[in-house]
Amino acid sequence: MIERSYFMPRIIDSNDKNLIGDKVKALRKAKKMSQQTLSDRLETMAIYVCRGSISRIEDKSRTVTDIELYGISKVLETPIESFFES
């Protein structure tokens, strides 16, 4: 059996599980929107991300799916590309 140390680490093994958490938080706060409001607006798009998950996305302890990112970008009225700009 090959030891795990011979494999490349998976992204979920790191402390930072997403690249966009800081940007989501900044954009949400700039719009004076609560985490619950963001969650509620995503739900109207049939994208179910609870308030606690929004918190974990923002502190980078939860991954984000492509559909979730799409919804977040629509609710925050910003292009998806902007989440990856420095």
Regions found by a protein language model. Give the residues of each.
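Flexible coil/turn residues that form the inter-helical turn or adjacent wing/linker of helix-turn-helix
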Residues: 20, 31, 47, 62-65
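Short alpha-helical DNA-recognition segment
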Residues: 32-56
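A short, Lys/Arg-rich alpha-helix, primarily the initiator
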Residues: 2-31
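Residue-level detection of the helix-turn-helix DNA-binding "recognition helix"
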Residues: 29, 43-44, 59, 70
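Short, basic-rich loop-to-helix N-cap that marks the start of a DNA-contacting helix
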Residues: 52, 59-71
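Hydrophobic packing within well-folded, soluble alpha/beta domains
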Residues: 24, 28, 38, 54, ...
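Short C-terminal boundary/hinge segments that cap the last helix of small helical domains
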Residues: 66-70, 74-86
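Residues that mark the N-terminal boundary/hinge immediately upstream of a DNA-recognition element
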Residues: 23, 34, 38, 65-68, ...
